[in-house]
Amino acid sequence: CIETVVMRYHYGNTVCVSTQVGCRMGCRFCASTQAGRVRNLEAGEICSEIYTAQKDIGERISHIVLMGIGEPLDNFDEVMRFLENISSPEGVNIGMRNISLSTCGLVPKIDQLAEKKLQLTLSVSLHAPNNEIRSGMMPVNDAYPVEVLMPAVRRYQETTGRRVSFEYSMVRGVNDSDACARQLADLIRGMGAHVNLIPINPVDGSPYSATDAA
């Protein structure tokens, strides 16, 4: 199964879409990866999430975030077709600046995306400022560690001229120390990036729990 979520804001309606049935990235805090990846969604299937959402709420969708089930850059070709279709006047005509694409950090695909110079927002699921913690949370970090990922993100920003966002799920006793905060600040210094601090949601089978509210 997949999920599609509509979020209403004062500036319009945002829909969060899935790009795969399941996910093979294995992030240890994520429920959607527990059964692995079943298959990629085709571009038309991702588009249908938008059309179905618009039909259900009876209102236009103005913003899209590719942050549902699946790793968008692990389904690169179909996601690129989806973006082309959904942003065209013949589609929903949603401008690229109103689209955000999330990735856990597939560096070759980040570079490939940068070459297209799309004006969307890249949102990097970082969740830790160093390899020791990040590899414990996200197996992808073993292939693309922080010292490889961050230069790729900077290259993306330099190539596209777009601000990058970093997602950081706060996990009690794991990545929420003052030392982690300082390391994170050093990591993104000079980027003009946005950091989204998220209380982690409890997941069955996961040892992680959310940081207490400040």
Residue ranges of model-derived segments:
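Long amphipathic N-terminal alpha/beta scaffold segment
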Residues: 1-8
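Short beta-strand motif preference
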Residues: 4, 15-17, 122-124
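Canonical Radical SAM [4Fe-4S] cluster-binding loop centered on the CxxxCxxC motif
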Residues: 8-45
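Conserved alpha-helical substructure of the radical SAM core
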Residues: 34-63
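Conserved AdoMet/S-adenosylmethionine-binding subsite of the radical SAM
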Residues: 54-63, 68-213
